[in-house]
Curated annotation (Swiss-Prot):
Compartments in which it is found: Secreted
Modified residues (4-hydroxyproline): 69
Annotated positions of the Cysteine amide modification: 71
Name of the molecule in the record: Conotoxin TxMMSK-04
Membrane-traversing stretches: none
Species, as recorded: Conus textile
Residues bearing the modification Pyrrolidone carboxylic acid: 55
Amino acid sequence: MMSKLGVLLTICLLLFPLTAVPLDGDQPADRPAERMQDGISSEHHPFFDSVKKKQQCCPPVACNMGCEPCCG
């Protein structure tokens, strides 16, 4: 029984070596500087334009009440 399990494990490791598994450091999410250089930032992405367009300026009185978009 143990020899069959050893043969099966050897075959699996030969067909799917552990080096084929990507490491965490290879993921683009771990390198935010390179991800931002790709030009896929949320400031220039078309999906986020509708969110920015919906924000309108608040009247000056609303700045005291916590309205953020134009109080800066």
